[in-house]
Amino acid sequence: MANKQKIRIRLKAFDHQVLDQSAEKIVETAKRTGAKVSGPVPLPTEREVITILRAPHKYKDSREQFEMRTHKRLIDILLPTPKTVDALMRLDLPAGVDIEIKL
């Protein structure tokens, strides 16, 4: 069987616009260096809801809810070249995006 290499990149961010811009940068960089790209695939958004009391002592019926959404994208780079890996390492992405890379 042939040696199949792929790089799997998972992106996470609270702001979906910044996340999509980062994903487009990665896809464009990989395609420019000659690798095949699959994605970006939108993964389910995590939604965390936090409920707190509005008043410091009593009034238990008065509560406030806050939510935090974590948007995720998945990009697979198939048949990466050394040039692709080098270009991805030098890529400058925004600070609000978390990146996980698996080889």
Swiss-Prot record:
* Assembly mode: Part of the 30S ribosomal subunit.
Which GO-annotated molecular functions does the record name?
A: structural constituent of ribosome; tRNA binding
Tell me which UniProt keywords the record has, alphabetically. Answer: Ribonucleoprotein, Ribosomal protein
What's the superkingdom here?
Bacteria
What the entry lists under HAMAP family is as follows:
Ribosomal_uS10 (MF_00508)
| Record-level GO cellular component terms | ribonucleoprotein complex; ribosome
Q: Provide the protein name.
A: Small ribosomal subunit protein uS10
Native organism is: Acetivibrio thermocellus (strain ATCC 27405 / DSM 1237 / JCM 9322 / NBRC 103400 / NCIMB 10682 / NRRL B-4536 / VPI 7372) (Clostridium thermocellum)
Q: What does this protein do?
A: Involved in the binding of tRNA to the ribosomes.
